[in-house]
Swiss-Prot record:
It comes from Caenorhabditis elegans. The keyword Membrane applies. This is Serpentine receptor class epsilon-33. Keywords: Membrane, Transmembrane, Transmembrane helix. The keyword Lipoprotein does not apply. GO terms for biological process: sensory perception of chemical stimulus.
Length: 359
């Protein structure tokens, strides 16, 4: 959606990744209610996923600092959607009609919203910014996770004791600076539609190269660890780091296919709308592919790791995730399979040693 204002300021042209339709009000109300019901289920899914990932720690703290905010940022995306719904249903009144806007970008004057001023559109502009920021936070976020894994592989000798929180903090600040800059650039059309593709076109090859590098390095480490005649000594934390990197790659491979499927569906849908292959009301389905991405990406992450999967299946079916802290906590010890028990013991021992090394 493109908004052009008659004001002569540098912010007179606005580009928003939102859609509006010319539909009867009762139809819009029904669609919005259905969307809100599905979003509530999605909110529950995101809550449970974050709860499980934080409860069952299987990865290094630095990876958590970088990866979890990416999943948590879905909340800002859905806030942007709620703002859009409020404008669609005219809960936020305007002195003019917004009309139909189903093109992600256009230079056709007939499809551009012309207004005397941006008064009354401030919340819609803010919602559009949140959606732009979410998209590019994922693009740059994936790259920062790849860089963090490369650093973890290269500095395997003393990664935990020397880096602590400084390295992920720097990566997080850089990625957010780039994400916010791109979001503002697109919002005020300082970045064109072609330039908007450059970040993911650059990020994807670098991330793939990092993936291949980390895979080869850690598979080499694993072979060396299993070699009884090796001369190099691997500490418990280093062995854990190798296993963690390979576990991340296993999860990352599945997430890559999930994200690529998500991008492919969105891309094909936008192209179909642009070339009028499908009617404009199909835009409801296409835009919700973005808003409901946790059903694909979140479930892929939760179901790819046995420990997460077990806890996720238990928690997702109950609304009561957090227990009253004043109640006594009863620990139930269950007999588990040897492989899983060994993993848990090794993980707990590693984090105890790691915590002692940081004191």
């Amino acid at each position: 959606m493109i908004i052009n204002s008659n004001s002569s300021t540098i912010f007179s042209s606005i580009w928003l990744p939102v859609f509006f339709y010319v539909e009867p009000l009762d139809q819009q109300v029904i669609i919005s209610i259905l969307e809100l019901m599905i979003y509530l289920v999605c909110i529950h899914l995101v809550n449970v996923s974050l709860h499980v990932a934080l409860k069952i720690r299987l990865f290094h703290r630095n990876l958590y600092i970088l990866a979890l905010p990416m999943f948590g940022m879905w909340y800002e995306l859905i806030i942007g959607k709620f703002i859009t719904i409020a404008y669609r249903l005219k809960l936020l009144g305007l002195d003019f009609e917004l009309g139909e806007h189903t093109a992600i970008w256009t230079n056709d004057p007939g499809k551009v919203l012309l207004v005397a001023s941006l008064n009354g559109l401030e919340l819609l502009i803010f919602g559009g910014f949140l959606q732009w920021h979410y998209m590019y936070s994922w693009i740059f976020g994936v790259l920062t996770v790849a860089v963090e894994r490369v650093i973890a592989s290269v500095l395997i000798e003393n990664y935990e004791s020397n880096t602590q929180n400084l390295m992920p903090a720097i990566l997080l600040i850089i990625s957010q600076f780039l994400s916010i800059s791109m979001a503002f650039g697109l919002l005020f059309q300082k970045v064109g539609p072609l330039s908007a593709h450059f970040p993911w076109m650059i990020s994807c090859p670098i991330s793939v190269a990092a993936y291949v590098f980390v895979k080869k390095v850690n598979e080499s480490f694993r072979r060396e660890i299993k070699n009884p005649g090796r001369k190099r000594i691997f500490t418990l934390s280093q062995q854990f780091q190798v296993k963690e990197n390979l576990r991340v790659l296993h999860l990352g491979t599945r997430l890559v296919f999930a994200v690529l499927s998500f991008i492919g569906i969105c891309g094909c849908g936008i192209a179909a709308l642009h070339y009028k292959i499908v009617p404009s009301y199909y835009c409801h389905l296409i835009e919700n592919v973005l808003f409901l991405n946790p059903f694909l990406i979140g479930l892929t992450a939760m179901l790819s790791i046995p420990q997460w999967k077990e806890q996720f299946m238990k928690s997702f079916l109950t609304v009561r995730l957090f227990r009253n802290r004043r109640k006594p906590v009863h620990i139930v010890v269950e007999i588990e399979e040897c492989a899983k028990k060994k993993n848990d013991v090794e993980t707990n021992l590693y984090f105890k040693q790691l915590a002692n090394s940081w004191i």
